[in-house]
Regions:
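Low-complexity, highly charged intrinsically disordered N-terminal segments
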Residues: 79-126
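C-terminal structured "cap/appendage" subdomains that terminate the fold
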Residues: 674-732
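Glycine-rich loop/turn
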Residues: 103, 107-121, 637-665
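Short cysteine-rich clusters marking metal-coordination/redox-active sites
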Residues: 50-56
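Intrinsically disordered, low-structural-confidence terminal and linker regions
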Residues: 1-50
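Long, low-complexity intrinsically disordered regions
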Residues: 730-750
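Cofactor-pocket helix-loop regions in the catalytic cores of large enzyme subunits
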Residues: 2-22, 112-400, 426-606, 661-698
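Long, low-complexity segments enriched in small/aliphatic residues
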Residues: 566-655
Length: 750
């Protein structure tokens, strides 16, 4: 059956969640984990005293939590982790690596939990079991033989706990390198850098309570209905309290049109809450121009719209910024944003009305552009004009995608941690951290491709499928002497390897770790809380991430060094005692975890204290530009389907966009299809362009969709092959997955 014959298409939905979400969740839970194991897990997930959802980083309520404090994606993440299926020695004996390469990412996901450590020896066709001790000694021998510690790459996924992340970066720095790339490099790195430059802190400045006091909530470049479904509950509560929600995005997404709360009887019977009152269909990468337009209106109106007292007391470079904005024409703003002057003026009026309590939320739609840092700083500029930061009901909210990606950075997973952190680490741990900055994700790929990095170690994740320029990244990994992955399930990164490859299976977030050990996570709003698994481990061979790191560190650095690795791993309280001596805000760490629901880390910008060199919040003055494709070409953005969390493919459907049984599709404006003589469902080949380079992806089905002319969208990881390794956000190094210049032609086989 052809891809077109498999494809089923319906009208895109105009609301999210409700009974279909409940049915989808339960079907997946029952199929993968079974009603008893899956049901018990759901009752513990996101509860006080339970375990943190392994999916997104949206926070749990501080006070009362419902008995079902999870969403469809969280339920699927738990089902995936709690599955009864196992992939062990017999599975890998039946399937060669070449055979596994031919299967889809969705098929890989369905094969179950990795049962025991596995090795792909040089020249072998199949993975084979290996003992833990032999695996650690093998990795240690490769690390010890490197010409320099900087020839090793230590990658981290946002799933790793605070305790695992802290021990991991301590191991890497004890070994002698700052090569600590992580998944944040590919998503919110731009947010952290922009906010640090503008307001002195790289984290969001709002709490859940602020949403209940906000007058206006901007959702920019994000799709909460799929990527952060529990956020819809918060937005619904805000709307019921009188807030207006504004969607700013090239696509109208169902989750912001309407919401049927899956725990409310009225919603099950058909009642839906309208969320967004306004939809601004900005052109791809037109957000900087849009926010510059908002600033222009606010400055034109002067005093009534501005918080002049805040500007005078708390900001710097206001007049420079004012002159810049006043010199920009409306023609430029309209052309670059794709939004009309009337729409911009109406939105500016909403922002400036009343008490100017405005929250702006954003995700990858802002962060994965060449000018991402400048765009996010422009968002901050508008907040500074309004004084909409550091007060109740107002602030900045980068909505992070993985459950502990923010905590991992707090723990030191970063290739360029500041001197105060390294000095504290050295003082408390008795090591000498390197000061030379390490490689981020893209730099790591380039180093492997140049044969400069020879050992790649990943603490979680699916590196090959998460990164840009898939073919280039595959070549880079294949040049390594050794690639190792700490994983729970099979993924494509296990199949495109160095000369020797290891899979080290670990416990999941939902599983018991000894008698009483637990870990902690930090959510998107800076709340640290304990996470204690309750389900029996999938296999008796599994080790915790902490124990894997500790045993590897001991095998590599010896038992008699400054850091007592195994002793630390035996009782996680000991790791937390070390963390509190190194990382500000974690004083009395273990004791404070007794507080129900965890504790908030300090946030200077929320308190209107600006940790910038100037000591104030800083207006930025970047030039206004927009990504422009050549004549006859389109601008492609990559995005998720609904049956997907990051690179994990739970199913083949994208329910809210009306797509079933297909993933190799490209959403196109109907007029763009017409002028290219492309009919709906036609197979097309896509070519991307970067400088003098081209990349190809063949056999995508063309789907007409409500998207701005000149724009296109396709799912990742399938479309990652088109994202050039050399195209990165200025300053942050984030791949520009939301702005890829492409052309499309009918496939020869069509």
């Amino acid at each position: 059956m052809s891809d077109l014959e498999k494809l089923k298409q319906t009208e895109p939905k105009t609301w999210a969640a409700g009974l279909p979400a409940v049915i989808s969740s339960m079907q997946y839970i029952f199929r993968e984990a079974g009603p008893l194991r899956g049901g018990n897990g759901l009752l513990e997930m996101n509860q006080k005293g339970g375990f943190d959802c392994p999916s997104c980083a949206w926070p749990d309520p501080d006070g009362h939590r419902s008995v079902a404090e999870f969403c469809e994606n969280g339920a699927k993440a738990l089902a995936s982790e709690a599955t009864r299926k196992l992939a062990g020695g017999e599975f890998f004996a039946r399937h060669s690596v070449e055979e596994l390469k031919g299967e889809s990412d969705h098929w890989h996901e369905l094969q179950g939990r990795i049962e025991q450590p596995m090795i792909l020896r040089e020249g072998a066709s199949h993975y084979q079991p290996i003992s833990w001790e032999e695996a650690f000694q093998l990795i240690a021998s490769h690390l010890k033989k490197l010409p320099s510690p900087d020839a090793a790459i230590f990658y981290t996924s946002g799933r790793a706990s605070n305790e695992a992340a802290f021990l991991y970066q301590l191991f890497a720095r004890s070994f002698g390198t700052n090569n600590l790339p992580d998944c944040s490099n590919m998503c919110h790195e731009s947010s952290g850098l922009a906010m640090k430059q503008s307001v002195g802190v790289g984290k969001g400045t709002v709490t859940m309570d602020d949403f209940l006091e906000a007058d206006v909530i901007l959702c920019v470049g994000q799709n909460p209905g799929t990527n952060h479904p529990r956020m819809l509950t918060t937005l619904e509560e805000a709307v019921k309290r009188g807030a207006k929600i504004i969607s700013i995005n090239p696509l109208r997404e169902a989750g912001l049109m309407g919401f049927a709360h899956p725990q409310h009887i009225t919603a099950m019977l058909g009642h839906r809450t309208k969320l967004a009152s306004h939809f601004l269909t900005v052109r791809v990468n037109g957000d900087l121009a849009l926010f510059r337009g908002l600033a222009k209106v606010l400055l034109e109106n002067g005093g009534p719209d501005l918080d002049l007292a805040f500007i005078q007391e708390h900001t710097q470079d206001f007049h420079v910024y004012q002159n810049l904005v006043e010199g920009i024409s409306w023609d430029e703003i309209i052309r670059m944003s794709g939004v009309t002057e009337v729409e911009i003026r109406e939105l500016a009026g909403l922002l400036a009305s009343g008490s100017r309590k405005v929250i702006t939320c954003w995700a990858m739609g802002l962060t994965q552009h060449r000018n991402a840092v400048a765009t996010i700083r422009e968002v901050v500029n508008v907040h500074l004009l309004l004084g909409a930061i550091g007060k109740a009901g107002a602030g900045l909210c980068p909505v992070r995608g993985h459950s502990n990606v923010q905590g991992d950075r707090t723990m030191g997973i970063f290739e360029q941690m500041p001197e105060w952190f390294l000095a504290a680490l050295d003082r408390e741990c008795g090591i000498q951290s390197p000061r030379k900055h390490g490689h981020d994700t893209v730099a790591s790929i380039l180093a492997m491709h140049r044969d400069e990095a020879k050992v790649f170690f990943a603490l979680g994740g699916n590196f090959l499928q998460a990164t840009p320029d898939t073919n280039f990244t595959a070549q880079a990994l294949q040049k390594c002497e050794l690639t190792c992955h700490v994983s729970t399930k099979l993924n494509r990164s296990h199949l495109v390897t160095g000369r020797t490859a290891l899979i080290l299976p670990c416990l999941g977030r939902s599983e018991l770790d000894g008698d009483s050990r637990f870990v902690t996570c930090e959510n998107s709003m800076g709340i640290v809380q304990p996470s204690c698994g309750s389900l029996s481990p999938a296999s008796h061979h599994l080790l915790s991430e902490v124990e894997i790191i500790a045993r590897l560190a001991e095998a590599t650095l010896g038992k008699n060094g400054a850091v007592p690795w195994r002793w630390l791993s035996e009782d996680y309280d000991r790791i937390r005692e070390l963390i509190e001596r190194v990382v500000p805000g974690f004083e009395n760490f273990n004791h404070r975890l007794d507080e129900e629901g965890g504790f908030y880390l300090p946030n200077s910008a929320k308190a209107r204290k600006w940790d910038t060199p100037e000591g104030k919040a800083v207006f930025s003055t970047a030039p206004m530009d927009v990504f422009q494709s050549a004549e006859g070409r389109l601008v492609l953005q990559t995005l998720r389907s609904h049956d997907q969390f990051n690179t994990t493919i739970y199913g083949m459907d994208d329910r809210y966009r009306g797509i079933s049984n297909a993933r190799r599709i490209i959403f196109l404006n109907p007029e763009d299809m017409l002028v290219r003589n492309i009919r709906p469902g036609q197979s097309v080949d896509i070519t991307s362009y970067w400088k003098n380079e081209t990349r190809e992806a063949k056999g995508f089905l063309a789907i007409p969709y409500e998207i701005p002319a000149g724009s296109a969208a396709a799912y990742f990881p399938e479309a990652n092959v088109l994202v050039p390794i050399g195209s990165q956000a200025e300053g942050s190094g984030t791949p520009t997955s939301k702005a890829v210049e492409i052309s499309i032609l009918s496939s020869n086989t069509d």
